[in-house]
């Protein structure tokens, strides 16, 4: 977010930050924790209420497995831990037949965040 950097002006005090993550695998490579990620985002943005976290990721398997789907193996995914630290978040399933319900929920979370957002 440096003035001369390629992302100059990306973080603005007059705008929400909407972070969207899409994955079909668990993060096993990161050396830090969801708490570290949360702290970094809040430090950069200044207010957790000015952030909307969205994630489409594997869910716990219910019933017969769907072909070509990845499932949460029963442990709490690190991205799930991260998004739930923020007051505004939505989570979708990588194996969903449609992503429309997820994005409708996501749009609702953004609207909720906008309604309570006071630009800095």
Briefly describe each language-model feature range:
Residues 1-118:
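Extracytoplasmic, non-cytosolic globular domains
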């Amino acid at each position: 977010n440096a003035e001369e950097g390629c992302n100059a002006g990306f973080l603005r005090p007059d705008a929400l930050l909407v972070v969207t993550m899409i994955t079909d695998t668990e993060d096993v490579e990161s050396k830090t924790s969801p708490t570290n990620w949360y702290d970094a985002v809040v430090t950069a943005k200044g207010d957790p209420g000015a952030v909307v976290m969205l994630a489409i990721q594997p869910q716990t398997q219910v019933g017969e497995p769907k072909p070509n789907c990845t499932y949460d193996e029963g442990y709490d995914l690190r991205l799930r831990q991260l998004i739930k630290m923020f007051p505004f978040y939505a989570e979708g399933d990588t194996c969903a037949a449609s992503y429309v319900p997820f994005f409708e929920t996501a749009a609702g979370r953004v609207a909720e965040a906008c309604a309570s957002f006071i630009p800095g």
